[in-house]
């Protein structure tokens, strides 16, 4: 370790070192907690942003795991300062955690700015906590390391493995079709999530922690360690030790989050069979780092980077436990080889290439080779056309190939309850060729782009044996979801995007190979409809939700707040201390 700072150069010294009344108060209040001066004087003070909560089962172990982080910090000669941060539980937070991703980003940035800290360990994992914490820490710019929660153990039902989320949708459809008893459903409920940790499919949580590692923000191999594995404890204490070194080295996010790192993260996301939610989060994180990333860049990567991780829902069999014991993300990145920029710096202080030395794959069916991929292209594709001028997203490998090229009449719903009532009507007049549409669920209209985009297959079609159909929305869907779902339509309908003009019976046409999505309605008719269109009222009339709807960007740029983007204005200065 090469020290680039002396103790008097530590940021926290501004609070504690001066011989004045204010600093005396800071020292006195620290001693009030039972600490002696020598425990923190001249040492890096490390913030631990802990997203533990009783309402977040994915982070249940963080209540104890934080002690392992503290142990590592103390071992390395630092002083830990645990700061609780907003815990975004995908299980409980409504209408959607995406409504609060930007709030967590704001909180993380301000927690780090306002406290006497020199570096940070970010403890997250469940879906939006990863981008929220990372976005805030990027904007603050202190040395930081990301500690992923890790996936839960695989589920079990009657001796068969269950994948969180993915099998919930699957078995619920069977219950709606009359093929599953109530008692059998209770067994599925009890067996699908049986330990702490985030979803063990390649959903949004596993996707985003993999992206964090590919960006260079975690220790090598950290992203796929199961939460219940003792290796997770050892990794946590190693994070504590390493962040102290990073402070002395002055290794800050802007040295790690380069264009090369972002390109690596995009390629890795595609190769993992990533969640569609990766799109809005990658765009937002890159923009926070001042790095250009567009939907076109993501689509280009999707055309050239095959899916290698045979993990559900894109894969057919395996779960994250299998992925980790097959070699984990290091093995997958090693197989990508020169498709990644091996010179990119990581929080370890080593280049990506150096961290991948010795990486092995122990199961070539779980982590495929470039010559034998799960899917010949990447996980995601971007469609554009008169229905989505700025873009829409689909996950081709996770849907029936019949729908890669399709046209059919639209069945349009303006609200979720309206759609829910229709799909539960066994007499609904619908065919497998219809395109089900839900609008009013985008960043402003939702608000927050709720995960409603995997519209349920209507009972009328389930009973005929159908399990997929084309669905279209300005909403998102869970990363554990699957099916022919076109999402993130931009501009959204709430702001007058073309989706707002679509009517029942209009023909919707998609062509995955051509990357197009259109409604076959002539321009004169669309002009008449636009003249008649009236913007819907906002759903929230005060407080944070009101602010969110007025400042959130569209999905094609990452749905961050306009006033938090890098180019909006000068970053806040260090706080005055009087």
What residue spans do the PLM features occupy?
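Catalytic or ion-coupling anion/metal-binding cores of large enzyme and transporter domains
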Residues: 2-54, 58, 67-86, 91, ...
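Glycine-rich phosphate- or other oxyanion-binding loops that anchor nucleotides, phosphorylated ligands
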Residues: 100
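A short, small-residue-rich loop immediately preceding and capping a beta-strand
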Residues: 113-133, 144-149
């Amino acid at each position: 370790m090469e020290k680039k700072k002396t103790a008097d150069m530590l940021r926290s010294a501004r609070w504690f070192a001066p011989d004045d009344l204010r600093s005396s108060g800071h020292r006195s209040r620290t001693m009030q907690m039972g600490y002696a001066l020598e425990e923190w004087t001249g040492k890096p003070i490390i913030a631990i942003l802990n997203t533990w909560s009783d309402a977040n089962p994915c982070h249940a172990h963080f209540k104890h795991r934080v002690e392992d982080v503290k142990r590592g910090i103390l071992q390395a000669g630092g002083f830990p300062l645990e700061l609780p941060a907003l815990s975004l539980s995908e299980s409980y937070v409504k209408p959607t955690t995406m409504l609060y991703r930007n709030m967590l980003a704001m909180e993380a940035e301000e927690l780090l700015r306002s406290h006497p800290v020199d570096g940070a360990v970010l403890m997250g994992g469940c879906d939006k906590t990863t981008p929220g914490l990372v976005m805030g820490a990027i904007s603050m710019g202190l040395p930081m390391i990301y500690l992923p929660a890790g996936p839960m153990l695989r589920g079990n039902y009657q001796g068969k493995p269950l994948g969180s989320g993915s099998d919930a949708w699957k078995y619920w459809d069977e219950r709606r079709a009359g093929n599953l008893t109530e008692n059998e459903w209770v067994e599925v409920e009890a067996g699908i999530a049986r330990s702490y940790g985030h979803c063990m499919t390649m959903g949004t949580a596993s996707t985003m922690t993999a992206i964090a590692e590919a960006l260079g923000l975690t220790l090598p191999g950290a992203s796929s360690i199961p939460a219940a594995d003792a290796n997770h404890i050892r990794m946590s204490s190693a994070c504590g030790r390493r962040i102290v070194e990073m402070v002395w080295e002055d290794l800050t996010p802007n040295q790690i989050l380069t264009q090369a790192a972002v390109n690596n993260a995009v390629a890795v996301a595609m190769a993992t069979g990533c969640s569609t939610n990766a799109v809005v989060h990658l765009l937002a994180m890159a923009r926070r780092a001042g790095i250009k990333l567009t939907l076109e860049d993501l689509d280009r990567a999707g055309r050239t980077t095959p899916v290698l991780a045979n993990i559900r829902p894109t894969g057919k069999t395996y779960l994250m436990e299998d992925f980790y014991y097959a070699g984990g993300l290091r093995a997958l990145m090693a197989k990508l080889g020169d498709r990644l920029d091996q010179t990119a710096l990581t929080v370890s202080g080593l280049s990506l290439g150096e961290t991948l030395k010795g990486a092995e794959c122990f199961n070539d069916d779980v982590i495929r080779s470039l010559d034998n991929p799960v899917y010949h292209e990447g996980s995601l594709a971007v469609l554009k056309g008169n229905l989505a001028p700025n873009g829409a997203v689909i996950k081709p490998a996770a849907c029936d190939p019949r729908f890669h090229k399709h046209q059919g009449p639209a069945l349009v719903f303006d609200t979720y309850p309206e759609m829910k009532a229709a799909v539960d009507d066994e007499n609904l007049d619908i065919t497998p060729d219809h395109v089900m549409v839900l609008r009013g669920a985008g960043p402003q209209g939702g608000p927050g782009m709720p995960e409603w985009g995997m519209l349920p297959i209507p009972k009328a079609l389930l009973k005929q044996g159908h399990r997929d159909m084309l669905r279209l929305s300005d909403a998102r869907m869970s990363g554990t979801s699957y099916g022919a779902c076109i999402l993130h339509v931009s501009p959204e309908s709430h702001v007058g995007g073309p989706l707002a003009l679509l009517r029942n019976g209009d023909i919707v046409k998609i062509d995955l190979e051509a990357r197009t999505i259109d409604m076959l309605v002539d321009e004169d008719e669309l002009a008449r409809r636009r003249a008649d269109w009236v913007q819907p009222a906002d759903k929230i009339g005060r407080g944070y939700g009101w602010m969110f709807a007025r400042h959130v960007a569209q999905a094609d740029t990452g749905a961050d707040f306009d006033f938090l983007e890098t180019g909006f204005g000068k970053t806040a200065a260090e706080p005055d201390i009087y």
